[in-house]
Amino acid sequence: MKKILAFVLIMAASLPQAISAKKNEVPSELKVMSYNIRLATGKDGTNSWEFRCPATIEMLKDQKPDVFGVQEALINQILFMKEYCEDYDNVGVGRDDGKKKGEFMSIFWNKKTVKMIKWGTFWLSETPEKPSMGWDAHCKRTATWALMKDKKTGKKFYFVNTHLDHRGKEARKNGLKLIVDRIESINPEGYPMVLTGDFNMKPDNPAFVGLDARMKSARKVAPKTDNHNTFNAWSVKPSDKVIDYIYFSGFSSCLEYQTVTKKYLDRPFVSDHYPIIARLIF
């Protein structure tokens, strides 16, 4: 009886200290980005990759995301960013063969602030474990996921990056559903989750219903946000083309959502999509 009483007294004495430590815990911020880089093609004239690649590096060094997902990147673009952004590493595969062929839905992270634990890629199709085209898609589409750890707090989180089909309506709907189902199955621990990507559909599309029920749109919930279009088509003219997104779950809040429209190295655009950023709090 005396031992039990002593244990209770010790626990009671330590409780205020635990509560005080929790109150004094400094919130940790995770800055994430989604960036459709526009694949390297000669069809873009003066907006081709060879002309805007230095501006991309300048943008990344200026914005300093902890983690970012790129869409449409070819292997030469991946290697260029790794060479000139020394603080970053990446994972991902080419969508055409699961190796280096085709566009990458790659995830980059700052090695100083984030640690990679494990990662994988699946295809948005009826056979997601192998390179394949799903439903009415025009191209092979993938999602890359990674389990990561914030070095400051030691907290783990998942980051998922994708690019839905630009033509197939069923492919977009079913692809997004597959992503939602998959990210739930790989995260039984319920770690915080980030989903980035070019979804090729506007916010009012019915295909968002399932995702909206499980995750929050940074654009919609951040107290500091904007209403800028994310697809620019190499034009500064405003439009309603909001097709790039950052969704999250498990974080305490989203401080800010931002569409990056700033010019770098006098280049009017770093892509035909504007990068988008969210500042999340654990």
PLM region descriptions:
Residues L30-I37, T56-M81, F108, A146, ...:
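Active-site beta-strand/loop signature of hydrolases that rely on acidic residues for catalysis
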Residues I4-A13:
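Sec-dependent N-terminal signal peptides
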